[in-house]
């Protein structure tokens, strides 16, 4: 495959160039190429069919992932935000027969794997059931979902390489030589952009542990630790979710040394949620080359991305070369040429055209604009339609607001559940008033409730997006009480 051809090429042409690095270890392209075939053979000889991978970010995660791809073994990354119950469900429902990571009940110890970067425990068991997989499946990535159990999206290596090839082409003018992974590698976006794309282009993927970056659990992040990590690990590129972009701007404003170092950035991609154009403008004024993109697991991750050779503020960029985007009559975004192989355990054939569930439009220059989720469109009691994602993106400009979720469907007024930034209670009301001045009357925040959403990780997806139905049910009594004065 293209990925391993490129690694072998750079092992010959630039053997001593760094390919992978962590705080403890570094592997050149030559060393990486020497490590992968024996490790792939070891996994293959063990008779492994489906391997569940539950490790922190680091070189072991990368080496196992790459070796499995080389050996034709299906990799099943276990998302770090899954509860113990969800982890057990994933292991059972996926038919995994091998596990690298912490012990789970019912798994037997096998001979540990000896890697140049250390020893890894290997656990085995015979699956009680083996759900069928689409032919060619190389990875099962689990969507974070908004309701119910997450779905296993089956992807082939060829599909993932098509996405990575397009990304490498779009980012090429930035001449990225080193990338720093800030998101978990279990996230398909970082797996592709933070590991595969650098290796395709001869760059170095720097992979610190999540703890070294300041992450704790699924949604807690210590800003001071992140700032120290960014100072320690100079980089040319980052991939961020909107909340991380907001934090990065705040850190740059408060830390001149960090702002000076980040001036060396050549490409910063942001996705995973709607981003206010004003937030990107602020980043660019600070010298950060931020480009918004869009994608979904069912399409192998990234579908569209702005880049150095073409950028339209407020859009998510032009579609990548490997796929085609069209807009349905009702405004839903449709994607062709990038469909997944199918869902794990589903017999339904995968349509050639993926209905994304997102609403948007293509402008005259071919840039894609996202307006919101089709199922999230809210209609007020006065018949006005609006997408809550739009209001929530505008709220990103309010320093006092850490997270916000808007509810107003069928109601005469909109209620916002707001998680304030620490120590900003006195500023919150003023900033909400300023936000309302920028919004039409039907989209304004009429009532708001302070809530600690990060204390309820089950209410958020892996990248911090709200699980709206769960949030509504969890806080329905408080929301109803807010509206009582309007409806009585």
What kind of feature is each model-predicted range?
Residues 336-337, 359-443, 447:
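AMP-binding/adenylate-forming catalytic core of the ANL superfamily
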